A protein has these predicted regions:
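Histidine-rich, glycine-flanked metal-binding segment
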Residues: 1-19
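Short loop/helix-cap segments at secondary-structure boundaries that form the rim of catalytic
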Residues: 2-8, 151-157, 337-339
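Conserved beta-strand scaffold positions in the cores of enzyme catalytic domains, especially
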Residues: 8-12, 77-79, 345, 351
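Divalent-metal coordination cores built from histidine and acidic residues
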Residues: 13, 18, 22-25, 36-146, ...
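Acidic/histidine-rich helix-loop elements
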Residues: 29-33, 86-100, 166-177, 234-246
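Active-site microenvironment of metallo-dependent hydrolases
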Residues: 40-43, 262, 274-276, 284, ...
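Helix N-cap / loop-to-helix initiation motif
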Residues: 73, 125, 290-297
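Active-site neighborhoods of metal-dependent hydrolases
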Residues: 109-120, 124, 171-289, 362-388
Length: 388
């Protein structure tokens, strides 16, 4: 942007609250199923940067380029290719590796496609984890991570993509069977320069505490019918004492890490959870656990920008940074629940208004067949990495 250059359009947000564009630090681009709905939903919920933590490399390159070229309405995408695994894979988006030659071919392809992150998966042996991390640092200049805080931290990785998720090593668990984390885990995330992408699936229970969220046009119009059915079902179930206790236990871990100086980037693992909406449930969970509005918001703005090495350009509202902004019809610093009332976003200075995003999609008569779409939703989420 050249100094003194007149704007072609002025946006009056004087009666709104403007914050840095939100990040979702753990997503999986799934255009083959969601079409343009996934990227539009993210914008509609105020997300201007999405971090892919696994998917098909060529498809992600296409999405990233289409967004940058203005051909696809969506957040900027930090792309990761397929999950780098050992001799077997868990998902279609994984790549199996038995030899160093095979791994080097995959990494050469990663360089050609300009990956923004390198992720190893649960059957990857130590040498795969280390060589992938080294390649990411030395050749790509990007971060690397996995599900494993140990041996991930010992092998040079930068973060874990969950607090606890699927894994194959008995000694790699970050939490106990009852969801508790202890001093050793907190020390890894606070004193070793090792970071955490938090994905609080337990926050989904909070949907039942605010059932009006299910009537939002972003749910009834933008979401595909299987997600609309899931949200409506969950909204009709007030959170139980047991669910809130489990949620509180997880939030206590995050609070301890943040209090100790650790960096937490908030993610969702969408579309395993409702796209866009779940980020707000997770933010509400953090605020409910005692974080101030500003502290909670930093986990989806400044801190992910730092975790992924993009804080020179993103994460705060400062002159000279990229114009990624979320415009809110309310003041989340006095009423945090209004954060979800996204009026518009700017991604790289390009304006997307809520009314336009919703207006581009029509309703589907088949949405009323609730049981059919609930079954579709269950099948799509079957055998995922984490319990909802």
């Amino acid at each position: 942007h050249r100094a003194g250059r007149p704007a072609a359009r002025h946006v009056d947000a004087s009666d709104r609250t403007v914050i840095p564009g939100l990040w979702d630090a753990h997503t999986h681009p799934w255009q083959t199923t969601y079409g343009g709905r996934q990227t539009v939903l993210q914008l509609a919920y105020g997300i201007t940067t999405a971090v892919s933590l696994g998917g098909f490399a060529y498809e992600q390159a296409r999405i990233r380029e289409a967004v940058a070229a203005g051909e696809l309405a969506g957040p900027r995408l930090l792309a990761t290719g397929e999950l780098l695994d050992g001799p077997r894979v868990a998902y279609s988006m994984g790549r199996a590796h038995r030899t160093r030659e095979g791994l080097q071919r995959t990494l050469a392809r990663a360089e050609a496609l300009d990956w923004d992150f390198v992720k190893t998966y649960v059957r990857a042996p130590g040498w795969v984890m280390k060589e992938a991390a080294d390649f990411g640092h030395e050749r790509l200049g990007v971060r690397s991570g996995s599900h494993l805080c140990t041996p991930g931290v010992q092998l040079g990785q930068d973060l874990t993509t969950h607090l606890q998720a699927t894994q194959r090593l008995e000694f790699g668990h970050a939490t106990s069977a009852t969801g508790r984390a202890f001093q050793d885990v907190r020390e890894i995330y606070t004193s070793a320069g090792f970071h955490l992408v938090a994905t609080p699936f337990t926050a989904l229970a909070l949907l039942g505490a605010d059932p009006a969220l299910a009537d939002d046009p972003r749910v009834t119009v933008l979401m595909p019918p299987w997600d609309t059915a899931l949200v409506r079902e969950q909204a009709g179930q007030p959170p139980t004492a047991a669910q809130l206790a489990t949620l509180g236990k997880e939030m206590d871990v995050y609070r301890g890490i943040l209090a100790g100086g650790g960096l937490i980037a908030l993610g969702t693992d969408q579309p395993l959870v409702p796209v866009g909406l779940h980020l707000h449930l997770a933010l509400r969970a953090l605020h409910r656990a005692g974080l101030s509005p500003a502290e909670a918001l930093r986990t989806a703005t400044l801190l992910p920008a730092r975790v992924f090495g993009a804080d020179a350009d993103l994460g705060t509202l400062q002159e000279g940074k990229l114009a990624d902004l979320t415009v809110i019809d309310g003041d989340p610093f006095t009423d945090f629940a209004t954060l979800i009332r996204t009026a518009a976003v700017l991604r790289g200075g390009v304006l997307f208004e809520q009314s336009d995003l919703v207006g581009d999609f029509g309703t589907d008569a088949g949405r009323d067949v609730k049981e059919k779409w609930l079954e579709v939703s269950r099948r799509m989420r079957r055998e995922g990495c984490c319990d909802l």
